[in-house]
Amino acid sequence: LENTEGSMSAQEIPLKLDGRISSYLQAYEQEDEELGRFVRLQSSCKGKLLIQKEIQQGLLHLYENGARTYFLCGETGSGKKLQCGLLCEAKKLPVLYVDSVRLMEQREPSDQICRRIKREAILKGNAAICFTGLPGDEEDRVDAQKTEKLLHGMRDWNGLLFFTSIYEWNRSIEGERKVVKVRIPDNTTEDRILLWDACLQEELRPADLNLIYLADKYRLTAGTIIDCVEEYQDRLLMKGAQPNMADLLAACTDQLEHRLGRDAVRIEAKYR
């Protein structure tokens, strides 16, 4: 893959490896008021996958210096998804892998796809999204417009964004070098509140807000709460039913009591 012209400078991050393996991460960084901070990572390895610990250290270095959008470049099988997973593991962030090819093949409108992806991201908290490639003809205007709409819809999303191909970023609509502008804000409490408020009517179901509330109240992840609800519904022979707030509270209370080994959790009456 060729460098983007002009505005990017290369910075090589040395990795301490044994003599049998030659590997490196190379980061191309750009900071722009409209784009935010992003990097392009390119990995090269002779014979073996990159050593996980060294990759993780390199990615953390970039993350701690403000990078929030990543382009993971390399040949098929070069460990691009592994690189994405390593950073998320180090920062204890859940990652949502999105198959861009399948998204483009679906007849579902781009705005609906964006709503679904953002809903997943909000439920996961400060999560990461990894787009796994987008092949095709650059001259396909319809596909390019759909791609632009999809990426523009991610502008208000909080978290980390990964692309496994620089091609997704450089697809042009007008002119030769027009890029899709996506800004990924830092995941502050204020940003999250504004995001929840903006998405409340259109992108979040009431049960989703219950999960967000419970995840904060009980310090449980949304996935753990969902597991609690499914177990609770199984006991009541209500599998598949939309859980209400009382079900959610009861399920979480049961889970916490189980963890504590005693009846140590009290729920105020107004929450039942």
Where do the model's predicted regions map?
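Conserved AAA+/SF3 P-loop NTPase catalytic/coupling segment centered on the Walker-B
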Residues: L123-L150
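AAA+ P-loop ATPase motor domain of ring mechanoenzymes
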Residues: S9-R107, Q112-R119, G125, G133, ...
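A short, conserved structural fragment
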Residues: L1-S7
